[in-house]
Amino acid sequence: MRASQWFLVTQKETPNDAEIASHQLMLRSGMIRKLGSGLYTWMPLGLRVLRKVENIVREEMNKTHAMELLMPSVQPAELWQETGRWETFGGQLLTMKDSNQREYCFGPTHEEVITDIMRNELQSYKQLPVNFYQIQTKFRDEIRPRFGVMRAREFIMKDAYSFHLSIESLQETYKDMYQAYCRIFDRMGLKYRAVEADTGAIGGSASHEFQVLAESGEDLIFYSDASDYAANIEQATSLKPPKANQACNETITLVDTPNQKTIDEVASFLGIASNQTIKTLIVKGKEHPMVALVLRGDDELNEVKATKHPLVHSPLSFIDEELILKTLKTPLGSIGPIQLNIPVIVDHHALAMPSFVCGANQADKHFINAAWERDAKYDDAYDLRNVKEGDPSPDGRGMLHCCRGIEVGHVFQLGDKYAKAMNASVINEQGQLQTMIMGCYGLGITRVVAAAIEQHHDEHGIIWPQALAPFQVNIIPLNGARSQTVKEQAESLYQQLKSHGIDVLLDDRNERAGVLFADNDLIGIPHRLVVSERNLEQGCIEYKSRTSSETQLINLDKVVNFIIELINK
């Protein structure tokens, strides 16, 4: 491609509303242009990268024998009403009516559609297992779209769906897709982790997220330094601590704590550390109006874990202070588990404390030297807390460490959630109708592009991994407009590299060298070749890698093989 015939428009200034590096650099390099809130046009340069992502994904999906199809973006409301998600999916579902007042949504995902198709197409166990995928535009009505294409309202996604009759078959396909995702991100040159994750609104029995590691990532990931264990903050657990091996010999004592309402205030007032206290949170229950959740004072409640407890209402709902005072006759800052006449669920780390300070269920009063069993009873012990840096890994191997990531893929073992709701069944080997079970496998095509930039950039611009770069090589002829020798040699080099199937940009614009070099660094082309009269006199071409500040001279007759070897490494 010749730059003079290419739409190459770069910007020196960083747009004011671009908060993170990928958003800034995608705008400055001319990859995208904003149309509206969370809506972006992919310009020619950006589209080249997007297509490379799609091609890698498509190749690896095809290797798993998944079959590509394309489903409508607009979906009838009846399908979503069958599964109950029309009401529960929330405000991110963009709904509309046609001229006949029939309701539709612009699909954020396609579980209902694929299940509807397959319940009509699949009749026998002989047709299973099957796996279908599509690469398609989705829409989620984000309240606050931000970070460019990282959290846009319209985005491109690869979503795949598999159908099975046995858990064993589902697990086999799940493993194949998991490995395909690993190959995809390996080929893209990205540093990533596959982490255990909550199934969220999609549902199912098991799931893994694929997180591209980046300091700007919104997700917290915990991983072991001595094993393969990794999970996001919602799912991460630590090794369960043993119960206190020594009984508390101190007498429980009621003390005054005037106007001390928070854990930090109580701990400071009593001259103790916050990890010597416990806190009691009152939430809505499933069968009981209120349920108490008890954690060590220095721990944070993990709301996702809490909602999985059978006694806790989902979504999690905290009881307001006025209702607590009216029902429990205790102000919020003085609540504790002793003689609390509602179900009490205690976190394992709180249960491991030999003694603790807790609210006394009287205004401005706390107990010190309280102990479980002797003084405080509980209904269940459960993992309620967010893990912390330095916690022991749940597999007993190593310690947990924290990093940040950007979720770019998510695979789920759905089970029969959608098939059961939509009566998707086939005849099994015994001649009986059996509900199918499903897996689903999502990968954010547009988000991968932004995540790659977040992981691969410097103060000058993007540093593309070779597999994703819009062009692999940039040839810059210095003063090509005035030097026929430079122009001809650059053209010859351009044609030779093209003949070997290499993506080459010949930057033949009539610009100063500084502008051409700066644009190359901004766009992030991995390999730069500079053709100049001075170097040609020595029979050389100047080479520079985007990852290095050093340049080197390559003999003219060796430069093509030199580039081919670099690209094939």
Swiss-Prot record:
Gene3D superfamilies: Anticodon-binding domain, Bira Bifunctional Protein, Domain 2. GO terms for molecular function: aminoacyl-tRNA deacylase activity; ATP binding; proline-tRNA ligase activity. PROSITE patterns: AA_TRNA_LIGASE_II. It catalyses: tRNA(Pro) + L-proline + ATP = L-prolyl-tRNA(Pro) + AMP + diphosphate. Coiled coil: none annotated. Pfam families: HGTP_anticodon, tRNA-synt_2b, tRNA_edit. It is an enzyme of class 6 (ligase). CDD domains: ProRS-INS (cd04334), ProRS_anticodon_short (cd00861), ProRS_core_prok (cd00779). Transmembrane segments: none annotated. GO terms for cellular component: cytosol. Keywords: Aminoacyl-tRNA synthetase, ATP-binding, Cytoplasm, Ligase, Nucleotide-binding, Protein biosynthesis. Its EC number is 6.1.1.15. GO terms for biological process: prolyl-tRNA aminoacylation. Consists of three domains: the N-terminal catalytic domain, the editing domain and the C-terminal anticodon-binding domain. Belongs to the class-II aminoacyl-tRNA synthetase family. ProS type 1 subfamily. Catalyzes the attachment of proline to tRNA(Pro) in a two-step reaction: proline is first activated by ATP to form Pro-AMP and then transferred to the acceptor end of tRNA(Pro). As ProRS can inadvertently accommodate and process non-cognate amino acids such as alanine and cysteine, to avoid such errors it has two additional distinct editing activities against alanine. One activity is designated as 'pretransfer' editing and involves the tRNA(Pro)-independent hydrolysis of activated Ala-AMP. This is Proline--tRNA ligase. It comes from Legionella pneumophila (strain Corby).
